[in-house]
A protein has these predicted regions:
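Histidine-acidic metal/acid-base catalytic patches
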Residues: 3, 7-26, 147-251
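Glycine-rich, positively charged N-terminal anion/phosphate-binding segment
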Residues: 39-53
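Positions that flank functional sites
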Residues: 33-35, 69, 107, 146, ...
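Active-site acidic/histidine proton-transfer and metal-coordination neighborhood
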Residues: 11-20, 51-63, 70-169, 176
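Residue-level preference for long, well-ordered alpha-helices that form the structural scaffold
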Residues: 43-46, 74-77, 81, 113-116, ...
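A generic secondary-structure micro-motif detector
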Residues: 5-6, 39-40, 78, 117, ...
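A cross-family glycoside hydrolase active-site/sugar-binding cleft signature
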Residues: 2-4, 29-31, 62-67, 101-103, ...
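A short beta-strand-loop structural module common to alpha/beta enzyme folds
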Residues: 26-37
């Protein structure tokens, strides 16, 4: 589960307790700025405490959902975003996570698209180099105006060309991803780089059964992370979500 947004008001203890109680949930992505307060400014002692708490639980701390983005035409802005990303890499290493999620958010109109793609790829490669030294992967979310096009994301990771640079499939319902009711073409395009998966409400027209089948066929053995809007009854929502996920996942 992603703490965005059902779990956003819970601290670490509550997140672990509620996910264990709901059953089926095995991992969590801690989105920055949420109530868990596991951020790059916490102390070494607190990092150790967080790591040990997750290690004692049934819930894996999978990654940190950052808002680092590298599409700005301004090199100084991109440099600062990479530096923020490094801090999250250190946090992920110290707390036992697998990776961090970053994102593109747009193709600025004042520069050619190929320039922005190159900027994002260069920043990804730089951050992946840093992550490799700490065993932390960098996952680019298929996200943002124009940049959520699977073809754009594929080109970014091709140019980044780094073992520690991968993609976070984001289950976007738009026509760039879903073609004639199917995500097969988009999935096959991005398949070599998919390291992390976001799924959303499930109760919509997105081809969930097909996606889960494609993931099984690809031997994807990581997590499909619930990313849903907040609920006034979060515990009830988790139980409902668990049941729907199980049904849609049936072979």
């Amino acid at each position: 589960a992603v703490t965005y947004n059902v779990l956003k008001d819970w601290d670490v203890e509550t997140i672990i307790a509620k996910l264990e109680e709901a059953g089926t949930f095995e991992g969590v992505e801690l989105r920055t700025t949420h109530a868990h307060r596991v951020e790059p400014d916490i102390s070494a002692e607190e990092r150790t405490r967080v790591r040990r708490r997750f290690e004692r639980s049934k819930i894996r701390l999978v990654c940190f959902g950052t808002t680092c983005e590298f599409h700005s035409p301004d090199a100084a802005v991109r440099k600062q975003q990479v530096e923020t990303g490094r801090k999250f890499v250190d946090l992920a290493h110290d707390t036992g996570a697998l990776g961090i999620k970053v994102r593109p958010n747009a193709l600025p109109k004042e520069v050619p698209p190929e320039t922005t793609i190159r900027h994002i790829a260069e920043s990804m490669r730089e951050l992946a180099d840093y992550g490799a030294g700490r065993g932390i992967e960098i996952w680019l979310e298929v996200h943002g105006r124009d940049t959520s096009d699977p073809k754009i994301c594929a080109e970014i990771v091709r140019q980044a060309k780094h073992e520690y640079a991968g993609l976070c499939w984001n289950s976007n319902p738009g026509p760039q991803e879903v073609v004639n009711g199917s995500v097969k073409a988009s999935f096959e395009l991005l398949r070599p780089w998919i390291k992390h998966v976001h799924i959303n409400e499930l109760a919509n027209d997105y081809p969930w059964r097909e996606l889960f089948t494609l993931l099984r066929q690809a031997r994807y053995d990581r997590y499909t992370m619930m990313e849903a809007q907040e609920s006034k009854e979060p515990e009830r929502f988790l139980r409902w979500y668990r049941a729907l996920w199980r049904e849609l996942n049936r072979p």
